[in-house]
Structure formats: C-alpha cells, structure tokens
C-alpha cells in the first residue's frame, strides 16, 4: 500500500516536530530520505516512503537492545526489521497503519538516546540544569 503525497507530508511534518525538538538535532537527506541526526553526525531516524518499492511509509530507528526482535515478532503489522541497518538492531516502524503518535515520539526519543552523547542526554533528562 503506497501513501498519498498528502499523507507522506503530514507524517513527515509530525516526525520533524518530534525529532527536531530533541537537543542538537538536524535534518538532511541521506540516501535520498529525510534523516535526522544528533550534532549533524549520528543518524537516529530515517524517514522512508516506499523504500525500493516495499509499499511502506516508515521510520527506521536505532533501537535499544532486544527491542527490534521483540516488536517485529509480536507486532509484524506495525514493526519490522529494516534492510541495511536491521543487522545493527535498528527497528522499522510503519506510519501507514493506525499510528499512535505518542508511541512514535517515545520510539524516536529512545532512538535518540541510543546515539546521543551523555552531555545531550543530561540536557534531555534535566532541562533546567
């Protein structure tokens, strides 16, 4: 199932809002996909629309140890092992099914936590410091 241009733009706008709210994040194209980086270096989210004809609107995110296998097995209609980065534990999150955006925000934050340095995690955990 491919998403309409309006659906893709709406989903990307929500992902941008979530990802760019995290400390020192940037967005740029990487491998032709909107991607989000910590300090413009480490990728923590890739946004894909119909990657190589897979028919999915999805995020690929860095996932905590064990999460990829658990979610891809328990909820294959929503989560999957993405190509190229799946062997490193990354998780595919479908955005073309019933999406819980609060859950997506938590997943994006978890991904950020996988790649961000401790100084930025401290900003995230203790913003008043």
Segments and roles (model prediction):
Residues 1-129:
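Charge-dense, helix-prone N-terminal extensions
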